[in-house]
């Protein structure tokens, strides 16, 4: 016969949520900086090709 499990305490639940949110925040920051670097690199490449086209 199935027996109900004990209820998880609120503090344990909050702790797990906090850990999850910190991991998500860390990944979001990392993704932002990667996108930022890629954007800067793309802008730099566009500027270089624009300069090369105007010199010719």
From Swiss-Prot:
Key words of the record: Chloroplast, Plastid, Ribonucleoprotein, Ribosomal protein
- Location(s), subcellular: Plastid, Chloroplast
Q: Which Pfam families match?
A: Ribosomal_L32p
Source organism, top-level taxon: Eukaryota
Entry's InterPro entries?
Ribosomal_bL32 (IPR002677), Ribosomal_zn-bd (IPR011332)
Task: Please tell me whether the keyword Ribonucleoprotein is annotated for this protein.
Answer: yes
User: What SUPFAM superfamilies is this protein classified in?
Assistant: Zn-binding ribosomal proteins
Keyword Ribosomal protein found: yes
Cite a single GO MF annotation: structural constituent of ribosome
Which terms under GO biological process does the entry name?
translation
What GO cellular-component annotations does this UniProt entry give? chloroplast; large ribosomal subunit
- Which family, according to UniProt? Belongs to the bacterial ribosomal protein bL32 family.
Could you tell me which HAMAP family the record lists for this protein? Ribosomal_bL32
Name the chain's protein: Large ribosomal subunit protein bL32c
Q: Which species does the entry assign this protein to?
A: Tupiella akineta (Green alga)
């Amino acid at each position: 016969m199935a027996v109900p499990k004990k209820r998880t305490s609120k503090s344990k639940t909050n702790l797990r949520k906090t850990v999850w949110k910190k991991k998500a925040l860390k990944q979001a920051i990392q993704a932002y900086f990667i996108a930022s670097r890629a954007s800067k690199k793309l802008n730099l490449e566009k500027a270089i090709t624009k300069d090369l086209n105007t010199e010719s």
